[in-house]
């Protein structure tokens, strides 16, 4: 399993995303550039230039027409995927931490950080109404006074957004009214990442409390827990196998204050039903910040603190592997 190494960032990777077909891989990092790559051979197709700060999040819509990025330069930007042209600039009072298109690609959401005296807000815009974009007026803006949103993903059918918070809570925010529909508090520390399964029925949350947990996305019922000895930065659900991949390791500033075994930086594979670990993939120098499965389930990618993105194609025997119960 020889990985393809993507070198396009000079700072640590913050998020990677495949488009629906999986032919493109988008990567953003703590530098101002968003990159798009061919996932089959790692060729860089182009960049989206315009941000002036670290880019925290990226998303691409269902038909790969538009790309959305959110940055620490206090803006969320909409791009034409093919040409790299900036279509919209939405300015905020604080850094944009998460962003996403709903299933239709018409509604976007993004959340802002609680910093510099500003509140954390979850904002919804309708791209079909140019007035909202021009006036920079979201049709709903939900204040999150309790604890800031650290990761968010759209729920099934675009009815709500599932958001993970700094205090370990997971909430569903309605896209119609902005109210909290359901909430779950299974994690004890900050949620670093939330990703949904391919059919949007399940979500997996990765947390600083050294676990990743699986929830039913509509009821937020807690289904599974995957335990490790180190903080989990990202977790993803395989679209074809009952497998989960997790990446983590502690933050660079904590390296000297913790025991060395916490600092291991492999990607770890767990069986989704048995909660058993069955494999590890080494490679990154430093923690893994983001993992993502290819939509066909035959490869996965990871982005690290070292600024590299690695695309791993699975060996044939991975697909025949059965875990003995």
Swiss-Prot record:
> Which Gene3D superfamilies did the record assign?
YVTN repeat-like/Quinoprotein amine dehydrogenase
As for subcellular location, the record says: Cytoplasm
Q: Which superkingdom does the taxonomy of this entry point to?
A: Eukaryota
Q: Which cysteines are cross-linked by disulfides? A: none
Manganese listed as a keyword: no
Give the record's GO biological process terms.
Answer: cytoplasmic translational initiation; formation of cytoplasmic translation initiation complex; liver development; sprouting angiogenesis; translational initiation
The record's GO molecular-function terms, alphabetically, read: RNA binding; translation initiation factor activity
Q: Which UniProt keywords apply?
A: Cytoplasm, Initiation factor, Protein biosynthesis, Repeat, WD repeat
Q: Which Pfam families match?
A: EIF3I
Question: Where do the WD repeats start and stop?
Answer: 8-47, 50-89, 144-183, 186-225, 283-324
The primary site where this protein sits is cytoplasm
Q: Can you supply one Gene Ontology CC term for this chain's record?
A: eukaryotic 48S preinitiation complex
The record's listing under PROSITE patterns reads: WD_REPEATS_1, WD_REPEATS_2, WD_REPEATS_REGION
The UniProt record lists the keyword Ribonucleoprotein: no
- Function, please? Component of the eukaryotic translation initiation factor 3 (eIF-3) complex, which is involved in protein synthesis of a specialized repertoire of mRNAs and, together with other initiation factors, stimulates binding of mRNA and methionyl-tRNAi to the 40S ribosome. The eIF-3 complex specifically targets and initiates translation of a subset of mRNAs involved in cell proliferation.
Family listed: Belongs to the eIF-3 subunit I family.
Q: How does it assemble?
A: Component of the eukaryotic translation initiation factor 3 (eIF-3) complex, which is composed of 13 subunits: eif3a, eif3b, eif3c, eif3d, eif3e, eif3f, eif3g, eif3h, eif3i, eif3j, eif3k, eif3l and eif3m.
Q: What's this protein's name?
A: Eukaryotic translation initiation factor 3 subunit I
- UniProt lists the gene as eif3i
